[in-house]
Amino acid sequence: MNPNQKIITIGSASLGLVIFNILLHVASITLGIISVTKDNKVHICNTTEVYNETVRVETVVIPVNNTIYLNHEPEFLNNTEPLCDVSGFAIVSKDNGIRIGSRGHIFVIREPFVSCGPSECRTFFLTQGALLNDKHSNNTVKDRSPYRALMSVPLGSSPNAYQAKFESVGWSATACHDGKKWMAIGVSGADDDAYAVIHYGGVPTDVIRSWRKQILRTQESSCVCIKGECYWVMTDGPANNQASYKIFKSQKGMVVDEKEISFQGGHIEECSCYPNMGKVECVCRDNWNGMNRPILIFDEKLEYEVGYLCAGIPTDTPRVQDSSFTGSCTNAVGRSGTNNYGVKGFGFRQGNSVWAGRTISVSSRSGFEVLLIEDGWIRPSKTISKKVEVLNNKNWSGYSGAFTIPTAMTSKNCIVPCFWLEMIRGKPEERTSIWTSSSSTVFCGVSSEVPGWSWDDGAILPFDIDKM
């Protein structure tokens, strides 16, 4: 039998089986119908039929994501750690605001300062409600006006109109972070009835009224927060005579305590404060008598010590030559009167010694250097162990002030001391300009010695607006 015949035979057999199967099904159905129609009686079924069924059980695994996201409640900054011992100060940032402002949308500002929270540092500044190289920048040499406001940008950014965040209306200010939220304080109003508005987390929370009716003012640098309580210093009274000075304490933007400082014959303004081992230490400005700087130290109960930086090296401006100066821990040293007006500055205690900044010029706000004066915190020492120039005497400087980086940001066991330096441009020194503004540099303490240089402002004046 050939293959084709085999296929035909198999196919025929298969077809026959299919037909036979169909006939069996038809016969089965026919017999079922006949049996139903022949017997209409109801029969009770007493039989039990057992069905043995095998059930297949399958395990189905469904992956479930059990990750639970919790909102972590921020903690208050501790800030009770000691201040780090440092061997020098390294450049950290430079905003170049005036240079950029010749063509960019940069605010006219003064009194810039820096403050840090647990995750970021910000540059704060007092605007004049005007942009550089614009007609509204005219006569912005004036300190107090209704157009001034405290604003902030990330550290290192210029005070530009696109990143700036509004903090408070004011022509005098301070700001700090308690670990949970920013607190900003702006002083505004008439000279004889100014008041401060406290903002906490961007919300106005309290007000401080002028108590002497003579230009209420505050630090122009960072306040200090320790374990959820924030501290700052305010002045009310004459700039060239005995005034009134108070320490304030707040919790979540609400004033909870205040204390007036007894300091007869002394003058305190524009304090630069920092935390150190649970206390607040401030190096301030005497605008009345002293070319040495006032020192104020207080604890959480506002118990305070007040005096002057002992060092036999003067750090205010204007001042006499170092060789002609004798320091004092208790009294102002210098000539009284408005000619000894001073400038905001800073210092950091390092054991018995002190790091202090000052202008290089003894008579004007130009140049800047940082000195380590051995035993300068406790006695009238003239020993300068380190001196670093950060701005040469050919360039205008201005205010300077303190801030610190908390351990929450650095993971160190000590608080890093830092300072900022303002470089004022325009009036009053550069009379071809119709405006006054500033840029700033920032330096932080490091464990190694670093060389100096001159990180000057660098803007070329006059601007176009000055030529109109």
Swiss-Prot record:
Q: Which residues lie on this side of the membrane: Intravirion?
A: 1-15
Q: How does it sit in the membrane?
A: Single-pass type II membrane protein
Q: Region entry Head of neuraminidase: which residue ranges?
A: 83-468
Whether Glycoprotein counts among this entry's keywords is: yes
- Which GO terms of the cellular component aspect does the record hold? host cell plasma membrane; membrane; virion membrane
Secretion signal, residue range per the UniProt entry:
none
Any single Pfam family the record assigns to this protein: Neur
Family stated for the protein in its record: Belongs to the glycosyl hydrolase 34 family.
State its role. Answer: Catalyzes the removal of terminal sialic acid residues from viral and cellular glycoconjugates. Cleaves off the terminal sialic acids on the glycosylated HA during virus budding to facilitate virus release. Additionally helps virus spread through the circulation by further removing sialic acids from the cell surface. These cleavages prevent self-aggregation and ensure the efficient spread of the progeny virus from cell to cell. Otherwise, infection would be limited to one round of replication.
HAMAP family assigned: INFV_NRAM
Any further remark recorded for this protein: The influenza A genome consist of 8 RNA segments. Genetic variation of hemagglutinin and/or neuraminidase genes results in the emergence of new influenza strains. The mechanism of variation can be the result of point mutations or the result of genetic reassortment between segments of two different strains.
| Record protein name field | Neuraminidase
* Designated gene of the protein: NA
